[in-house]
Amino acid sequence: MSIVIGADAAGLRLKEVVKNFLEKENFHLVDVTAEGQDFVDVTLAVAAEVNKEEQNLGIVIDAYGAGPFMVATKIKGMVAAEVSDERSAYMTRGHNNSRMITMGAQLVGDELAKNIAKGFVNGKYDGGRHQIRVDMLNKMG
């Protein structure tokens, strides 16, 4: 499993905080950030890399998280969540089988961002009754 991470200019500093944290937790990181990318381009780059392997997960950071979330939901088969707390990050894996989260650097601080990332990457899909909704989401697009 790889954790694919990317950020636009507004999310660069926080992306480095999250990236360094996850590397210290021994996760394999793929950083697709390129200088000058806006949130649309970076979200598309993260999604493309996430979709290479079923186990891959993605994190996109910009100023508020809303823009990358909107982009991610336009990608067929991508289930994404905009999160600003640890519990939502964890639960979106368990109940929605989300493969990507977005967060805003102007909304969450360093420690919260690390906890959000930790909750997301450590979350496991519960399946069962949740699969009905996931199937519905996957048919969209």
Swiss-Prot record:
Keywords: Isomerase, Lactose metabolism. Its EC number is 5.3.1.26. Pathway: Carbohydrate metabolism; D-galactose 6-phosphate degradation; D-tagatose 6-phosphate from D-galactose 6-phosphate: step 1/1. The gene is lacA. It comes from the Bacteria. GO terms for molecular function: galactose-6-phosphate isomerase activity; ribose-5-phosphate isomerase activity. The lineage of its organism: Bacteria, Bacillati, Bacillota, Bacilli, Lactobacillales. Heteromultimeric protein consisting of LacA and LacB. This is Galactose-6-phosphate isomerase subunit LacA. The keyword Ligase does not apply. Belongs to the LacAB/RpiB family. It catalyses: aldehydo-D-galactose 6-phosphate = keto-D-tagatose 6-phosphate. GO terms for biological process: D-allose catabolic process; galactose catabolic process; lactose catabolic process via tagatose-6-phosphate; pentose-phosphate shunt, non-oxidative branch. InterPro entries: LacA, RpiB_LacA_LacB, RpiB_LacA_LacB_sf. It is an enzyme of class 5 (isomerase).
